[in-house]
């Protein structure tokens, strides 16, 4: 009994000593700034006002955000903003690939804040993605983390990633954090904007039902694009998405009065370089003293970039386009190649952050990530953004979650088919799968609408007859069906067209076909005016006049 009382007494004493040690150690670990902050009452509305300033709207003037701090200047570590913790210094605690954990003793940065690694060979920007607790944040690197070590100092910039915007970006190539990568010196401007912004409010948005003529027959006739709308180019690997988007830049940007922004998201560096050279040759981009006359800005985050850069470069390109729309009232063309890589990069980031994957291994936030980008691409009362997006379709499966989620945001879809490309018909646009909200008699007029529907009807009938032809042959068809097949094959070949950007490969000069000429030409084929011409004369030509000239040439060659 006495031994039990002695044991209980010893346990109580040790517990009291341990509790005292714990309370003393906790008291020592509380930062003085935290105790001062808790004892001082916050001014009324202070945090609310800071939150309003931190969250920038899409219609905010371009001159408000300040230039991002340069890592070359030695920061003092003094906090200049209590809400964002700007100016505070943290330390790298863990590096796993593109994910970097940083600890801040004070001045914890909010989500999406940009941090800059100090004493680094290159300017390395990190974006806060998660708060882990105990003053630790998990960030995504916008560049390679080679050479980064634990204990390295990190500066809290107090704002999201901020990039230069305005006319100074025209004719230049910038990366995800707004640095010039064309070796033509830094971009000199007073206008900077954060890449994370809200979509325009409902009252600011406007919709106009106006067709955007591209000069490409199959697009203008069967799936016309809306000015100020969102257009998707769907296709698997190697069916011609990038060539089509380059032809659109060539045709539309030349005839278009406003500015263009091209965002290269996770695509081949070679193609980005080719596009830059072609733009210089065609006069879309001008160098030297005439740079201010350039019509296009390029934003690149290519295949070799870390997932953080590929996940954010689309937002950088969109921010540049938004400035032209909101501050200058321009009608802007935004080309994104490839929007699937945006989804793919966000999937990589999601896995690195430890989120449980959703369907087919994609991130659970797939719809949210895509919606945040797509909803900012819109037409306002000040100006418009017409977006053309190349969309890679994994394994040619249009039901894959990535392309399927994108469908909901688009006004027109141009589907590129491998079966059509195997026939040697380029652009390999599927005339039956491609759709457009603009295909209405109230918008296009009766002539255009009836011609487009007539072409689709003939092609659909031909598709239905192909099984019969494969089993029984052409001889078993009725005379009407034989005529349908003959006209469908001519229409199929007439939808092909030589491109300006493909002249170096094909040797054939590119053709730009006016919309009225396209309508009249196809209506003539439907009416049977050209039934006597051979199929071959309809292949890779512009208007119907070229078809007749080619048919005469073929007839002369065969007669000789």
Swiss-Prot record:
Keywords per UniProt: ATP synthesis, ATP-binding, CF(1), Hydrogen ion transport, Ion transport, Membrane, Mitochondrion, Mitochondrion inner membrane, Nucleotide-binding, Transit peptide, Translocase, Transport
A Gene Ontology molecular function term of the record: proton-transporting ATP synthase activity, rotational mechanism
Ranges where the record places region Disordered: 20-44, 58-81
Catalytic activity, as annotated: ATP + H2O + 4 H(+)(in) = ADP + phosphate + 5 H(+)(out)
Subunit details: F-type ATPases have 2 components, CF(1) - the catalytic core - and CF(0) - the membrane proton channel. CF(1) has five subunits: alpha(3), beta(3), gamma(1), delta(1), epsilon(1). CF(0) has three main subunits: a, b and c.
EC annotation from Swiss-Prot or TrEMBL: 7.1.2.2
Biological process (GO), any one: proton motive force-driven mitochondrial ATP synthesis
PROSITE patterns, A to Z: ATPASE_ALPHA_BETA
Assigned GO CC terms: mitochondrial inner membrane; proton-transporting ATP synthase complex
Organism: Nicotiana plumbaginifolia
Chief location of this protein within or outside the cell: mitochondrion
Catalytic EC class: translocase
Name of the featured protein: ATP synthase subunit beta, mitochondrial
Alphabetized HAMAP family for the sequence: ATP_synth_beta_bact
Chain residues that bind ATP: 235-242
Record's keyword annotation contains ATP-binding: yes
Name of the gene: ATPB
Annotated function: Mitochondrial membrane ATP synthase (F(1)F(0) ATP synthase or Complex V) produces ATP from ADP in the presence of a proton gradient across the membrane which is generated by electron transport complexes of the respiratory chain. F-type ATPases consist of two structural domains, F(1) - containing the extramembraneous catalytic core, and F(0) - containing the membrane proton channel, linked together by a central stalk and a peripheral stalk. During catalysis, ATP synthesis in the catalytic domain of F(1) is coupled via a rotary mechanism of the central stalk subunits to proton translocation.
Subcellular location: Mitochondrion; Mitochondrion inner membrane
Residue span of the annotated presequence: 1-54
Chain intervals with Low complexity compositional bias: 33-42, 58-71
Pfam families documented for this protein: ATP-synt_ab, ATP-synt_ab_N, ATP-synt_VA_C, Synthase_beta
Family: Belongs to the ATPase alpha/beta chains family.
